[in-house]
Amino acid sequence: MRFSLALAAAGLAQTAFAAPQPSRGFGCGAPEPSEELLQVSQQFAVEEAQALAESYRSGNLTARDVTAQAISVKVYIHVVAASTALSGGYLTDTMINNQFSVLQSAFAPYGISFTLAGTDKTVNANWADDSKGYEMTMKRALRKGTYKDLNLYFLQKMGGNLGYCYFPTTASPGSTAYIRDGCTILYSTTPGGSSTNYNLGHTATHEVGHWFGLYHTFQGGCTGAGDSVSDTPAQASASSGCPVGRDSCPSQAGVDPIHNYMDYSIDSCYEEFTPGQQTRINSFWTSYRQNAS
């Protein structure tokens, strides 16, 4: 999903990591999940509930045991910069490793591990600016691995976005859906970056959640199926900051899940996925990525 982030003043562009950018709100700019994908999620919800009920009847499993499948993902990181300067988006190896560590720590409690399969750095001013429309050209040149492997692209400019990613789908090798798969992320959201309040590396965590098939916690608002995950409380709209106690759907159970990685809270507010989201990740993984070529 794409996060809207107002552009920093031009004078700050050359001092990207040295001077923090002022904090600004953001919102999703990517297309909503398709009706077909929403129906898939609702079917998963039915199947997951049946499996959980059966596990309790048998007395063999707890709620978390249902999601015990371990998932291991190869990751390819691509740094796409306008120049070899840090202000041009040219992340250092230390920054890359720190970002990778954040991903590992965020997903490890849910049975998901990552292996850094490769990194590369490309200097191309056109590719480094997502707003110029070179996404597919860039990805045709840089993408590696199979559909079950995660490609992360860190760009200098995102046209006002923090990042976006694509949901799992049926994708044959060489198809548009296959090539564009992965996450594109603003370089300054990496740990220690200049995107104030969004520089602990959790933009990547949020985007990878989409790659695994998770929707925003506020998907669908207060009515209907929402994000189709039973243990994420209904939420009318995205959070801003870290509004503890916010309850945007007072007629529904629970307060807003502001600490969930799939809300729009600031990085320091993020803490968790839910067991239901873990189950959903497993459902999408098994159906779309696990055996993909």
UniProtKB/Swiss-Prot annotation:
Give the signal sequence positions. Answer: 1-18
Q: Which residues are glycosylated?
A: N60
Role noted for this protein: Secreted metalloproteinase that allows assimilation of proteinaceous substrates.
Give the UniProt subcellular location, in the record's own words: Secreted
Q: What is this protein called?
A: Extracellular metalloprotease PODANS_2_14170
For the protein in the UniProt heading, the enzyme class is hydrolase
Task: Report disulfide bridges, numbered on this chain.
Answer: C242-C269
Keywords in alphabetical order, please. Answer: Disulfide bond, Glycoprotein, Hydrolase, Metal-binding, Metalloprotease, Protease, Secreted, Signal, Zinc
List the molecular function annotations (GO) for this entry: metal ion binding; metallopeptidase activity
GO BP annotations listed: proteolysis
